[in-house]
């Protein structure tokens, strides 16, 4: 760059540097002349005035401990460079392995078991069963439960003008809570009750309840409190003399028992359906349980939401799933040959039932907000078409048929709807018959709080299949901690309650023919009115 001519910028920069150096040199000379600081001394020279050298201080003695501490230490090196895994990584790996093991254990616990079970293999707690012992109106405020506040009372009965209706109201309202034990002491299942049924026997009330984790509870309500306990009821300090009722808890399923039924012609067999994708048959005489239907692979997850059987056929099972399927299976033939399935909805079917006297008709309730009526005689697998459908404002929880051809539904739009297909001539319809939207409108709509929330089982109507009078009636749980009973025309017949009911008896069921009503709660406890 020596031969190159400097630019104007470079010339100016060099001039500034030279000017700054000259200024600094002048300032230094001026400061020395007035004695602000002495001039620099040659290396090794002492100031002129310091003739005597200063005495050096004696070297400080260093203790052995300090010397050891001052010794050179090994150079720090990271665990990564030394080939050692970091503690956080080891802990994370152990935590991941632990979580994976827990998930696998939970998956295995929830996977259905296809084996046949004996009583000892199913028994969780309580008394061992034997075949001999086994057989022998309106909620005004939407979404707000008002515990113990009645919406139907004796005043409503007194105001009734219809003689038959008044007599039935008096009869149903006269049902009393089973007083041998308070409801909060009758814990039939460990977890929340999802399904219940009575044994069809009229000799004694025998109740079955299924819970969230696949437990099956059994209660014989013909038992009486021991005399020793009855005489000590008033002695609060002597709890040992007041035993709980005799209950039995079994575990035939690994997941929620969603539905159960006993065919009247086979009273010794209880059928249970579960979210573990299986339907099992429990022989009440032999106290054994066998799998009657399930998908081919245990890895297939097809939760079953409903189960029913035709009155004239004790060999055929009908069910619905949370995937929107409807199935039929004849237990006398191999499952792979006779199990038939239809996809009836894109969303889950929460409940269904067959028309008892004409079981080729059935009604479904779906999350897609519809209640649909179907005819098995004209049900295509490729594109099934319903006889008719009615759409509610919100999802429909259940659709229950009675022997008179009426369907009762419960819906999240806070209503109970009754569709009277019997009055429309359903018994004489030919295959292919269809109903218009106008014909599918409900005949009766009753306001009812159905906002169960997360912890209460969904409210579902359940008819008495063989009522003792010509008036049809069904029961359903009430969020105010009652069980309501309605007639087929929508008239409220009773509101059953009592002392000691501390939770909503959400799962309510009628005995087939006797005026016995049971209600199950989220804590696994039951109430019984007789």
From Swiss-Prot:
UniProt record, GO biological process: DNA damage response; regulation of DNA damage checkpoint
InterPro entries for the chain: WD40/YVTN_repeat-like_dom_sf, WD40_repeat_dom_sf, WD40_rpt, WD_repeat_DNA-damage-binding
Disulfide partners: none
Region annotated Disordered, chain positions: 34-115, 224-250
GO MF annotation terms: DNA binding
Alphabetic keyword roster: DNA damage, DNA-binding, Repeat, WD repeat
Compositionally biased residues, Basic and acidic residues: 89-108
Stretches forming WD repeats: 188-229, 252-292, 302-339, 344-384, 389-430, 453-496, 499-530
Function summary: DNA-binding protein that binds to both single- and double-stranded DNA. Binds preferentially to UV-damaged DNA. May be involved in DNA-metabolic processes.
Entry protein name: DNA damage-binding protein cmr1
Organism whose genome encodes this protein: Aspergillus terreus (strain NIH 2624 / FGSC A1156)
């Amino acid at each position: 760059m020596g031969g190159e001519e400097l630019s104007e910028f470079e010339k100016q920069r060099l001039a500034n540097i030279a000017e700054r150096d000259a200024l600094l040199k002048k300032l230094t000379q001026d400061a020395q002349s007035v004695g602000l600081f002495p001039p620099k001394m040659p290396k090794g020279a002492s100031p002129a005035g310091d003739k005597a050298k200063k005495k050096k201080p004696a070297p400080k003695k260093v203790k052995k401990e300090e010397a050891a501490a001052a010794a050179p230490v090994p150079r720090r090196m990271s665990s990564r460079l030394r080939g050692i895994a970091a503690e956080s990584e080891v802990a994370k790996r152990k935590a991941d392995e632990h979580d994976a093991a827990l998930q696998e254990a939970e998956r295995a616990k929830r996977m259905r078991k296809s084996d046949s079970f004996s009583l000892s293999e199913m028994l969780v707690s309580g008394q061992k069963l034997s075949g001999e012992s086994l057989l022998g109106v309106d909620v005004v405020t939407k979404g707000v439960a008002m515990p113990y506040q009645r919406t139907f009372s004796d005043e409503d009965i007194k105001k009734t003008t219809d003689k038959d209706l008044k007599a039935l109201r008096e009869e149903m309202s006269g049902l009393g809570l089973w007083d041998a034990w308070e409801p909060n002491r009758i814990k039939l299942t460990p977890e929340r009750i999802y399904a219940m049924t009575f044994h069809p026997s009229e000799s004694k009330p025998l109740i079955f309840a299924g819970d969230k984790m696949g437990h099956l509870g059994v209660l014989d309500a013909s038992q009486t409190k021991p005399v020793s306990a009855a005489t000590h009821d008033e002695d609060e300090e002597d709890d040992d003399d007041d035993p709980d009722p005799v209950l039995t808890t079994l575990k035939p399923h690994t997941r929620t028992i969603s539905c159960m039924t006993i065919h009247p012609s086979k009273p010794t067999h209880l059928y249970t359906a579960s979210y573990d994708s299986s339907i099992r048959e429990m022989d009440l005489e032999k106290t054994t349980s066998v799998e009657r239907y399930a998908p081919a692979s245990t890895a297939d997850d097809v939760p079953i939401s409903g189960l029913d059987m035709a009155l004239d056929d004790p060999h055929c099972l009908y069910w619905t799933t949370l995937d929107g399927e409807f199935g039929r299976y004849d237990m006398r033939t191999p499952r792979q040959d006779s199990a038939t399935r239809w996809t009836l909805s894109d969303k889950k079917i929460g409940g269904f039932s067959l028309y008892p006297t004409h079981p080729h008709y059935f009604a479904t309730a779906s999350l897609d907000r519809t209640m649909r009526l179907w005819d098995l005689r004209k049900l295509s697998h490729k594109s099934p078409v319903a006889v008719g459908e009615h759409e509610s404002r919100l999802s429909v929880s259940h659709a229950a048929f009675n022997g008179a051809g009426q369907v009762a539904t419960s819906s999240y739009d806070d209503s109970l709807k009754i569709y009277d297909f019997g009055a429309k001539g359903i018994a004489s319809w030919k295959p292919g018959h269809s109903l218009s939207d106008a014909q599918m409108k409900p005949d009766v709509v009753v306001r009812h709080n159905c906002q169960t929330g997360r912890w209460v089982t969904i409210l579902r109507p359940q008819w008495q299949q063989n009522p003792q009078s010509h008036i049809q009636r069904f029961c359903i749980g009430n969020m105010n901690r009652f069980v309501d009973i309605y007639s087929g025309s929508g008239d409220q017949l009773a509101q059953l309650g009592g002392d000691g009911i501390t939770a909503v008896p959400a799962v309510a069921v009628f005995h087939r023919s006797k005026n016995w009503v049971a209600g199950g709660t989220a804590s696994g406890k039951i109430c019984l009115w007789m």
